[in-house]
Amino acid sequence: MAIHDDRMKAMLFEGPSQIPVSVGILPAAWRLHREKLNDVAAKYPSLFGPENRDRDFDAVGGTYVAGEHIDAWGCVWSNLCTGMESIVTGHPVPTRDDVRTLKAPEKDVGTPHGFMFLRLTDLRGFEEMMIDFAEEPPELQMLLDIVRDYNVRQVSNMLPGLIGAEPRIVYFGDDLG
């Protein structure tokens, strides 16, 4: 409960006992440094979570596996090296006309990091999305509405699982830099 209390205090600027942070390590780093990295993580459980001496250093899944992956929206993710982060190299909505026929996925895949801004750039490509933001064509609002409605559906699906005795914090990761 102390971690939750510190998070609430930090969000409300009420002087938490610690600044709440978490550290994520790429699978490639675990694969390379193995037990040495596990020793570092064990030394700092407040940053890395509980000690895990049974870690499978070679277990890599999803878009961390080298190759091309297509997500529920039709974005093509490319990864050159297993364990590293992949990047979107194929944007399924390259033109404004394509926005007019875009349908959100029927499949519910949750709320990945890149909840709104990154999803928009994944769909359109960074340059095209920046032009859309600058010019504000009608297709921009159409795209925003499609992604927003999908995200609302994902959050609605998640809410029943958050009801319980312990207070929960829900956050949505995104990135503009």
Sequence positions of predicted segments:
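Catalytic cores of TIM-barrel enzymes
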Residues: 1-177
